[in-house]
Swiss-Prot record:
Catalysed reactions, as listed in the record: pyridoxamine 5'-phosphate + O2 + H2O = pyridoxal 5'-phosphate + H2O2 + NH4(+); pyridoxine 5'-phosphate + O2 = pyridoxal 5'-phosphate + H2O2
EC class of the enzyme, as a word: oxidoreductase
Gene: Pnpo
InterPro entries: Pyridox_Oxase, Pyridox_Oxase_CS, Pyridox_Oxase_N, Pyridoxamine_oxidase_dimer_C, Split_barrel_FMN-bd
Pfam families in the record: PNP_phzG_C, PNPOx_N
Entry function: Catalyzes the oxidation of either pyridoxine 5'-phosphate (PNP) or pyridoxamine 5'-phosphate (PMP) into pyridoxal 5'-phosphate (PLP).
Modified residues (Phosphothreonine): 238
Modified residues (Phosphoserine): 241
Assembly and interaction partners: Homodimer.
GO annotation, cellular component aspect: cytosol
Matches recorded under PROSITE patterns: PYRIDOX_OXIDASE
Protein name per its UniProtKB record: Pyridoxine-5'-phosphate oxidase
């Protein structure tokens, strides 16, 4: 007698014992239904209205939300962000890294040019950033072209880092295949001895980027799922054609709109 059952759908609720619970289900070929996993966000009285914008310049609005995130004791790294890049033929990749500066011109981050993201930015210099501040029920999404920062700026930032981090950047040819972790340990120890009394030179393959924002979307969660989304866009040729009734002028060349959640 054979059984034709290929998989089982398991509706997730908090198990009596956590350790190994998901691994146990996966090993049994179960499909985990996580639909019931949800939490309450904000109430309608806390909705993010257009009148609540601190500025019609989205970079200033970002600065306001970022400051709140930095001051929130439940957020460990307010500058943590997801960077999404894409190959020329449309294959995306994403990873978490840290924002290292922002200003009127854009968002700065540093990495290894030989990494996957570095190669993708070289062949397709456009990217998206996502900041998610879960305790505040807020998210900011940014899109735009990316350019390498001047070598001098990268050099200055590199040498502002702890020496151990500088050595780590030299040790790791990011995204390359290595035999094991011991390989990294040995190389790190060797370079630690080599540069004990001297400056660590910045590798040519390490540097920074700036993302020039063309789209910035501010999202705030609502318990009833009628989330707030206000998006700013620029670079639009609006001079010869009037804006629609739901599109509004922001500062400089920005316009903004409310999007359905």
């Amino acid at each position: 007698m054979t059984c034709g059952l290929l998989s089982v759908t398991v509706t997730f609720r908090r198990p009596a014992k956590w350790p190994g619970y998901f691994r146990h289900l996966c090993c049994r070929g179960a499909v985990m239904d996580l639909g019931p996993m949800r939490k309450s966000y904000r109430g309608d009285r806390e909705a993010f209205e257009e009148a609540h914008l601190t500025s019609l310049d989205p970079m200033k609005q970002f600065a306001s939300w970022f400051e709140e995130a930095v001051q929130c004791p439940d957020i460990g790294e307010a500058n943590a962000m997801c960077l999404a890049t894409c190959t020329r033929d449309g294959k995306p990749s994403a990873r978490m890294l840290l924002l290292k500066g922002f200003g009127k011109d854009g968002f700065r981050f540093f990495t290894n040019y030989e990494s996957r993201k570095g190669k993708e930015l070289d062949s397709n210099p456009f990217a998206s950033l996502v900041f998610y501040w879960e305790p505040l029920n807020r998210q900011v999404r940014v899109e735009g072209p990316v350019k390498k920062l001047p070598e001098k700026e990268a050099e200055n930032y590199f040498h502002s880092r702890p020496k151990s981090s500088q050595i780590g950047a030299v040790v790791s040819r990011q995204s390359s295949v290595i035999p094991d972790r011991e390989y990294l340990r040995k190389k790190n120890e060797e370079l630690g001895q080599l540069y004990r009394e001297q400056e660590v030179p910045k590798p040519e393959y390490w540097g920074g980027y700036i993302l020039y924002p063309q789209v910035m979307e501010f999202w705030q969660g609502q318990t009833n799922r009628l989330h707030d989304r206000i998006v700013f866009r620029r670079g639009l040729a609006t001079g010869d054609s009037p804006l629609g009734p739901m599109t509004h002028h922001g500062e400089e060349d920005w316009v903004y709109e409310r999007l359905a959640p």
